[in-house]
């Protein structure tokens, strides 16, 4: 029983985990993480300001989150501070983010250090002005901490600054800087700088005996890097990994052949497509070279798979077939994807299953991606078992 997973983002990792848990060691193909490596650390099933009820975290998703080791999911919603100055609810969060629900009605110190991309007084004022802070009487204020050791640390990327604190010397220096600041809040809120490999937020919490955590990360920041490390650890245990770009997926007999650059082709009974949407490059914009040619979408690799937009199949691009972005809006970029049914089965392709942002018309959210990856893996296993 051979099953392949195409994609190394959240959906692909969830699918690989579920396959391994049920006794099938998958082959996982991916070159990059896609949009999963860009996420900020807040975990949702749908856009957070449209949520009307608390979504349930089922047993399968909770099991995957525990195995991944990078997320915190609970029976109630969390509340996080964003890098942009918002206080918002989240169904879960990456480990290291400060859960503000634990700090309701208390004094939260926003670390003030001289980085060019960080304005602690402005952020503290924005957090304090949020409806949640006013309702819970939570006080945010800036607190100067002299944690920079070199001038270039003012302007290096958030990822690089976080990585500096993986060393014992820098993590100890940061703790010392906080201790000598003369400030004794009920919680400390940092930017997304508390290490990549080490759980520095937990270490500081234990040393200071108050909650310590971060805001969300920017694109390509610490949260995405931590996910990638956790993914690599899980896949090393559960899957055969091929770090290569897939160029073709072709039907062969009752199964499929996967062709990737600088790899021998592999044949599989079923394949989970977790190749991402437009943001990840799994779905590409395509331009016709005809004189009056239009613009449309295609998969980034050759496969017998139809793309769908608003429940309509997206045909090849030509002067007669084109996506009108003026009429449809840029939201089209978040809607287009592989045409599949509720059971994740790719239309007209027995043995193919889609997950995550690769699916048409599904929320582009981390927990939705994980849930759909688990579902696609389960459906793939059901298909293979029926076929054999």
How does the language model describe each region?
Residues 42-115, 121-133:
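Dinucleotide-binding Rossmann-like beta1-alpha1 core, especially the glycine-rich loop
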Residues 232, 247-266, 271:
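Conserved beta-strand-loop-beta-strand element in the redox core of flavoprotein oxidoreductases
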Residues 281-287, 352-388:
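A conserved FAD-binding loop/helix module that cradles the flavin
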Residues 3-6, 266-276:
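Short hydrophobic core segments
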Residues 124-131, 165-248:
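Helical element adjacent to the flavin cofactor pocket in flavoenzyme catalytic cores
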Residues 1-28, 377:
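N-terminal Rossmann-like FAD-binding beta1-loop-alpha1 element of flavoenzymes
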Residues 27-54, 145-160:
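Conserved N-terminal glycine-rich FAD pyrophosphate-binding loop of Rossmann-like flavoproteins
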Residues 297-363:
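FAD-binding beta-loop-beta segment adjacent to the flavin cofactor pocket
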């Amino acid at each position: 029983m051979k099953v392949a997973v195409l994609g190394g983002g959240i959906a692909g990792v969830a699918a690989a985990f579920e396959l391994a848990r049920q006794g099938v060691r998958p082959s996982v193909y991916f070159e990059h993480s896609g949009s999963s490596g860009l996420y900020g650390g807040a975990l949702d099933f749908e856009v957070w300001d449209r949520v009307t009820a608390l979504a349930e975290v089922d047993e399968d998703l909770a099991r995957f989150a525990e195995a991944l080791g990078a997320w915190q999911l609970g029976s109630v919603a969390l509340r996080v501070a964003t890098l942009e100055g918002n206080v918002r609810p989240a169904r879960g969060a990456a480990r290291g983010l400060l859960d503000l629900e634990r700090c309701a009605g208390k004094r939260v110190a926003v670390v003030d250090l001289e980085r060019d991309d960080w304005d602690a007084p402005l952020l503290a004022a924005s957090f304090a002005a949020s409806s949640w802070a006013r309702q819970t009487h939570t006080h945010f204020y800036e607190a100067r901490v002299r944690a920079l050791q070199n001038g270039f640390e003012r302007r290096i990327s958030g990822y690089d600054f976080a990585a500096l604190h993986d060393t014992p010397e820098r993590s100890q220096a940061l703790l010392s800087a906080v201790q000598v600041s003369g400030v004794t809040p009920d919680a400390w809120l940092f930017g997304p700088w508390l290490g990549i490999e080490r759980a520095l937020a937990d270490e500081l919490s234990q040393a200071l005996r108050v909650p310590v955590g971060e805001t969300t990360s920017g694109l390509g920041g610490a949260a995405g890097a931590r996910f990638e490390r956790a993914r690599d650890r899980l896949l090393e245990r559960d899957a055969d990994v091929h770090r290569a770009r897939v160029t073709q997926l072709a039907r062969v007999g009752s199964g499929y052949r996967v062709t990737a650059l600088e790899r021998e082709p592999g044949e599989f009974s079923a394949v989970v497509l977790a190749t991402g949407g437009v943001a990840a490059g799994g779905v590409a914009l395509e331009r016709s070279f005809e004189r009056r040619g239009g613009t449309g979408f295609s998969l980034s690799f050759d496969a017998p798979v139809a793309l769908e937009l608003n429940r309509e199949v997206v045909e090849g691009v030509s002067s007669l077939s084109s996506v009108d972005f003026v009429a449809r809006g840029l939201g089209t970029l978040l809607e287009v994807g592989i045409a599949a049914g509720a059971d994740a089965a790719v239309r007209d392709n027995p043995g193919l299953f889609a997950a995550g942002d690769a699916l048409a018309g599904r929320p582009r959210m981390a927990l939705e991606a994980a849930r759909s990856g688990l579902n696609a893996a389960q459906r793939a296993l059901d298909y293979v078992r029926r076929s054999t």
